[in-house]
Amino acid sequence: MNRNDYDVVIIGGGPVGCITGEYIKNGRVLIVEEHQSIGVPLQCAGLISKNGVKELGNPKGVVNKVRGAYIYSKNSMVKIGNEGIRAYIFERKVMDKDIAIRAAKKCDFLLKAYGKIEKDKNGYKVEITHLGEKITLNPKIIVGADGAKTITGKKLGLVNNKNREILSSCQFEMVNAEVDDDFVYIFLDRKYSERFFTWIIPMGKDRVRVGLIDRGNCYNKLIRFINENKIAKEILKNATITEFSTGSLPIGYLDKTFKDNVLLVGDAACHVKPLSGGGLYFGAMGGKIAGEVISKYLNEDIENLELYDKRWKETFGSEIKNGLRVRKLFLKLGNDTLDKIIEKLSKSDLIDYINKHGDMDRQASLSIKVLKSLDIGLGFRILRDLL
């Protein structure tokens, strides 16, 4: 492998990195992946909206379809959903590999390899460590698809603790669960997750994923949830853990996601829904935009990568910003207020509106309407001021 063998090097072989490579129409592309197999380890609940599945190119790996959600606060519950399919549950190992196979028709892969950027006089180069061997490449473009804790973004000075927060996730796969396979279970209880929520996601055939996102030791919090929450205890009373996974989640907004000849995609760019933590929908859209902009650059139709920032911000930037504002309010609410919101919502006409117009991928807009419509005695001047 020579210094100038590739026009584009993508650091990270997850779905977004692979979609970026797939959408580069010209040039030689190398995808560098630190793990020895695509899709391992599991770092996602695998719940993807209908629109998200389309953005991902309708990959293989569906194990269940869901029609809605049971949303629980500490003492209240509301059921959202109707007869229509709202989302799909994926076996991520199968899905990720299917997307990677598509990318492999256009791109080369280097597995069990670690790539990092280094500054040189012409921009940035890539230094790769692969099976003890060090390789230096000088591509025209580098893509940082290296996830929530992106080293690429930090080295560029684009990512820091002020423009994003890193949360931890913990998840079990369990069998022998007694669950309604048509609905996801969401738990808004500060006892178990102070900064996000807890979930039970049915995979079909008595399998579930049980997880939470928060700061600190998520494992102990998840064990506590399973042992103490009355709904979880009933669903999981005969269940056994068959798999354990952890991950990281970036919540924030980057004003700039490129520098010189490097750009960031996916979790590295904070292309994540602030209210649910889902990163595949915005990530896939951003990856496609990145691939198209890189193609223009390689064709010398544009002089720099600024168009990438412009296009993703126009496409979904406002949804991330609004989601962060709603999340700021959400973090101020204790269990008593969450109970009040869920109880009021369960008795309101908004359920019909949500079932008809609700969009998993545009959560901020829906949340704003719901909170403004509910009279819960909080003086929602707070919400007005935030938005």
From Swiss-Prot:
Pfam families associated with the record: FAD_binding_3
UniProt xrefs under Gene3D superfamilies: D-Amino Acid Oxidase, subunit A, domain 2, FAD/NAD(P)-binding domain
InterPro entries reported in the protein's UniProt record: FAD-bd, FAD/NAD-bd_sf, Geranylgeranyl_Rdtase_fam, Geranylgeranyl_reductase
MF (Gene Ontology): FAD binding; oxidoreductase activity, acting on the CH-CH group of donors, NAD or NADP as acceptor
Family to which the UniProt record says this protein belongs: Belongs to the geranylgeranyl reductase family. ChlP subfamily.
Name used for this protein in its record: Uncharacterized protein MJ1520
Native source organism of the sequence: Methanocaldococcus jannaschii (strain ATCC 43067 / DSM 2661 / JAL-1 / JCM 10045 / NBRC 100440)
Taxonomic lineage of the native organism: Archaea, Methanobacteriati, Methanobacteriota, Methanomada group, Methanococci
